């Protein structure tokens, strides 16, 4: 298996040279899940970061849960500002996943303590946010700020899903985090669809056994 790509600072350095000083990375977690919210992270990182952890930052999807938690602590402690947006399954079913993801990202930006002057976004364009921005394909693998945002989003969502396990026992949410794993599908077949499941997502839209 090839080594994961190390995200770089090329985008940020280019923007700093143009005069932008408050550059926020944005990414989401939970877009493809069958249960729970979609969560977005926004983060403004300072230049010239130091520490062994900096070289460990990657797209959250290629990191172990333990390493994500470790990096999350360093990222939020060193960030100029960070914000999290959460859009629940009811809103996802009403809006659709793409608009819901954009809404979560908008919330994350609004929760920043300082207003960014440029957004670096993983893949998406955000027309509802009136700020200069750039959507980058595979941005979470290529861009340091977006990779940091991906870790914030993933850890924030995973923690929320672990909390929801107490409210919805028997679904093992802490294990699969709402993704469509074999374990999750077995739980659904035994218990039916819960109030936090996304009813418009296949194969759940054909099930109506709501607890």
Swiss-Prot record:
<dbReference type="InterPro" id="IPR022898">
    <property type="entry name" value="RNase_HII"/>
</dbReference>
<dbReference type="GO" id="GO:0043137">
    <property type="term" value="P:DNA replication, removal of RNA primer"/>
</dbReference>
<comment type="similarity">
    <text>Belongs to the RNase HII family.</text>
</comment>
<dbReference type="InterPro" id="IPR012337">
    <property type="entry name" value="RNaseH-like_sf"/>
</dbReference>
<keyword id="KW-0255">Endonuclease</keyword>
<protein>
    <recommendedName>
        <fullName>Ribonuclease HII</fullName>
        <ecNumber>3.1.26.4</ecNumber>
    </recommendedName>
</protein>
<dbReference type="GO" id="GO:0030145">
    <property type="term" value="F:manganese ion binding"/>
</dbReference>
<dbReference type="GO" id="GO:0006298">
    <property type="term" value="P:mismatch repair"/>
</dbReference>
<keyword id="KW-0464">Manganese</keyword>
<feature type="binding site">
    <location>
        <position position="27"/>
    </location>
    <ligand>
        <name>a divalent metal cation</name>
    </ligand>
</feature>
<keyword id="KW-0963">Cytoplasm</keyword>
<dbReference type="GO" id="GO:0003723">
    <property type="term" value="F:RNA binding"/>
</dbReference>
<dbReference type="InterPro" id="IPR036397">
    <property type="entry name" value="RNaseH_sf"/>
</dbReference>
<keyword id="KW-0479">Metal-binding</keyword>
<feature type="binding site">
    <location>
        <position position="28"/>
    </location>
    <ligand>
        <name>a divalent metal cation</name>
    </ligand>
</feature>
<dbReference type="GO" id="GO:0005737">
    <property type="term" value="C:cytoplasm"/>
</dbReference>
<dbReference type="Pfam" id="PF01351">
    <property type="entry name" value="RNase_HII"/>
</dbReference>
<dbReference type="InterPro" id="IPR001352">
    <property type="entry name" value="RNase_HII/HIII"/>
</dbReference>
<dbReference type="InterPro" id="IPR024567">
    <property type="entry name" value="RNase_HII/HIII_dom"/>
</dbReference>
<keyword id="KW-0540">Nuclease</keyword>
<dbReference type="GO" id="GO:0032299">
    <property type="term" value="C:ribonuclease H2 complex"/>
</dbReference>
<feature type="domain" description="RNase H type-2">
    <location>
        <begin position="21"/>
        <end position="211"/>
    </location>
</feature>
<keyword id="KW-0378">Hydrolase</keyword>
<feature type="binding site">
    <location>
        <position position="122"/>
    </location>
    <ligand>
        <name>a divalent metal cation</name>
    </ligand>
</feature>
<comment type="function">
    <text>Endonuclease that specifically degrades the RNA of RNA-DNA hybrids.</text>
</comment>
<dbReference type="GO" id="GO:0004523">
    <property type="term" value="F:RNA-DNA hybrid ribonuclease activity"/>
</dbReference>
């Amino acid at each position: 298996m090839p080594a994961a790509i190390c995200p770089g600072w090329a985008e940020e350095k280019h923007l700093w040279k143009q005069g932008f000083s408050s550059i926020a990375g944005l990414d989401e977690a939970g877009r493809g899940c069958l249960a729970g919210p979609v969560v977005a992270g926004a983060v403004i990182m300072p230049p010239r970061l130091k520490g062994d952890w900096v070289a460990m930052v990657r797209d959250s999807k290629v990191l172990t849960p333990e390493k994500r938690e470790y990096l999350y602590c360093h990222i939020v402690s060193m960030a100029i500002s960070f914000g999290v947006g959460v859009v629940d399954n009811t809103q996802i079913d009403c809006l659709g996943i793409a608009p819901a993801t954009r809404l979560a990202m908008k919330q994350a930006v609004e929760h920043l303590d300082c207003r960014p002057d440029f957004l670096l976004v993983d893949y998406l364009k955000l027309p509802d946010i009136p700020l200069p921005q750039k959507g980058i394909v595979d941005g979470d693998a290529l861009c340091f700020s977006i990779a940091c945002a991906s870790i914030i989003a993933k850890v924030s969502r995973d923690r929320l899903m672990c909390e929801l396990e107490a409210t919805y026992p028997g679904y093992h949410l802490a294990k699969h985090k709402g993704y469509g794993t074999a374990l999750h599908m077995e739980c659904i077949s035994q218990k039916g669809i819960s109030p936090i499941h996304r009813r418009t997502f296949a194969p759940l839209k054909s099930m109506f056994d709501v607890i």
